[in-house]
Amino acid sequence: MIRTFLIATASAAVLTLSPTAFAQQPSQYGNAVEAKAMLLKAVASVKADKTKALDMIARGDFKDRDLYPFCFNLSDGKIQPYANPNATNFGQDVRTQKDVNSKAWGVEFYAAAQKPEGQITDVSYMFPKPGADKTPVAKESFITRVGELGCGVGYYK
């Protein structure tokens, strides 16, 4: 009888504690699925009200951990303000941007944004994570055209 009671108590404890004991903690970094979902949300916002959406992007309203949308003009390649503490390239031509390995990711971003609206292209390159450490790491960005803008969201691999 005592043995049955102990087994039942232990089983109940395991079932009660399992959801919290085995629950996954959210990652401090976003992933490809989350990046693409954020891009689609930002695109919908730009289509609804471009000026308001660009203000929201600059303020960081879309930002989630290390994920953030960014946009650039297709007419001149100028990068619009976006919420990244490492960003020093506002107003620069995206086509001039290169990673530490001299890969011209900006040219690839610009070319991806020339494709038909709604087509999403992924571009891989090296880029520092937001924060104090400026060491470049592998990153992939999803890029698409939204009217006269190229917009994207990247995640660290």
Question: What residue ranges belong to the model's regions?
Answer:
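N-terminal membrane-sensor/transducer module of prokaryotic signaling receptors
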Residues: 2-157
